[in-house]
Regions:
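Regulatory N- and C-terminal appendages and interdomain linkers associated
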Residues: 1-24, 31-33, 41, 54, ...
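An alpha-helical support segment within catalytic cores of ATP-dependent transferases
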Residues: 4, 8, 13, 125-135, ...
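Short, conserved clusters of charged catalytic residues that mark active-site
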Residues: 7, 29, 58-61, 71, ...
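Short coil/loop linkers at secondary-structure junctions
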Residues: 18, 72, 158-162
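Structured loop/turn residues at beta-strand edges in well-structured enzyme cores
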Residues: 20, 71, 207
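Glycine-rich loop motifs involved in handling phospho/adenylate chemistry
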Residues: 23-26, 50-51, 136-137, 189
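Active-site acidic catalytic loop and adjacent metal/ATP-binding pocket
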Residues: 24, 31-38, 46, 76, ...
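ATP-binding pocket architecture of kinase catalytic cores
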Residues: 32-143, 147, 153-157, 182
Length: 212
């Protein structure tokens, strides 16, 4: 993916970060790019989301909503929604995956993550769900659950699951959906996993769990 160097420098200059040093961060499963920018000892994260391929506005709505509820989504330092640039608070490198790989105890990390989910479910839907965010449908939930048979099992078994097996798995979830509908509705964080959760020292409770 082409790097929009001149546009990035203009955006950073307009945000007061002219001349900042850049280092590339890991990409995610999208067209977005991320860079850590450093200036006079300060750090921030640049999101480059090319218009036409990505839209930063849903990210902004959800990040601001989570922050307003006391959770630790990245703060928004500067934005150019038309150009697809955001300058974000740098939450650090202590992702749960790195901590676990380094031998940290799993239980405290997962307890922290569960505290976030409990906190979200305590928020009335009218308070937790930003305006303009589509409902999380049964079909979408089944699609997410089917990632197990579409991707994980084939990778582990080194062969595709037979089509009738994958269909049967989806049918089981369809039968379970009425039970899910009884659960109170709240905001759903679709990428809530160890690579997108960060321990933030100096914050307490659910706020100690950074959300990417």
């Amino acid at each position: 993916m082409a790097v929009r160097t001149a546009e990035i420098e203009n955006f950073l200059a307009s945000a007061g970060w002219a001349g900042a040093d850049h280092s590339t961060l890991a990409e995610d499963a999208s067209f977005r790019r991320y860079e850590r920018v450093t200036r006079s000892g300060e750090q921030a994260v640049l999101m480059d989301a090319p218009p036409g391929k990505e839209d930063v506005r849903p990210f902004l709505r959800i990040a601001r909503k989570l922050t307003s509820l006391g959770f630790s989504a990245p703060g928004i330092l500067a934005e150019d929604t038309a150009a697809g640039f955001l300058l974000l608070e740098d939450l650090g490198d202590a992702t749960f995956s790195r901590l676990l790989n380094a031998g940290e105890a799993a239980a405290p990390l997962y307890e922290m993550a569960v505290d976030v989910l409990i906190g979200l479910h305590k928020c009335p839907p009218a308070d937790a769900v930003p305006a303009g965010i589509a409902p999380y449908s049964d079909a979408l939930l089944i699609d997410e659950a089917a990632l197990l048979v579409d991707w994980y099992l084939p990778a582990v078994a080194d062969e595709d699951l037979p089509a009738d097996g994958a269909a049967a798995y989806r049918e089981i979830w369809a039968v379970l959906m009425p039970l899910v509908s009884d659960v109170p509705k709240t905001l759903v964080l679709r990428d809530f996993h160890v690579d997108n959760l960060i321990r933030i020292d100096g914050r307490d409770g659910a706020a100690a769990c950074g959300l990417l």
